Amino acid sequence: CYYWLHRMGHESAVLWAAHAVHHQSQDYNLSTALRQTSSGALLGWVFYVPMALAGVPPLVFGVVALIDLLYQFWVHTEQVGKLGWFDRWFCSPSNHRVHHAVNDAYLDKNYGGILILWDRLFGTFKDEDDHEKCVYGTRGLLNSWDPLWANAQVYAGLAHDSWHARHWADKLKVWTKPPGWRPADVAERFPKPAFSMAQMQIFQPPMSRAVQWFALVQFAVLLTGVGAFLWQADTAPLAHNAIWFAVLLVGQWALGAVMQGRIGMLMALMLQSAALATATSALGFT
């Protein structure tokens, strides 16, 4: 089930819109594994219905899903080379580097989460070539530190093309066809340049030393806040969680905006303070 969910996440535009968040990073390290979609569960559950119909107990499903998720953390690294026989049977760092690459030779390969046998069985396996360095990211470059835009980018593009398509069938196909497919009339009115590896430049807007230190401290504070939020989320009321989630989101958005030079550090602190004050007032804190 996971193999087909993952594969369709690359072959169906609406599923790719959710999964793209995980692939947007132009670096490939353990932090990439933590870059997870916020909307994948909206349609992803459909692929696990056969397991429910087959009578798989929820506890077994949950444990296996957790093992699958935790296993995939360590394969997001460039520090581990090829592992010989292990690469032939399992999802490994080498195999998963191929999966994250945008090179023509590597595109849409190696979907297996733990076993790579599924890719060998269904014809989607590709070995990492020592002469073809993996280039990471997405072909529709994000070029932003905005967490909201990161989650909405692909959806926005699909909505635009669907809205402007003249034929109703094309309005639907925009969402179901493979990523990159566009109705002829939309492509003519809103042309996009063809993909080129030359455009895969690392997004690295200039930052002063002060901004770099500001970002480091802010990230540490936000990371602590996220940890505290997750620690109590299961027992806290929904309204409580929603309010603190909004505070953290404002903080993350403001930090990204500072790093891109869209707002200054003082403005970011003012926005974060306003969000925090509003939250504490709404929750009745004094």
Question: Model-predicted segments: where are they?
Answer:
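Weak global preference for isoleucine
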Residues: 67, 114-116, 202, 243, ...
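A short structural micro-motif
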Residues: 69-70, 178-182, 277
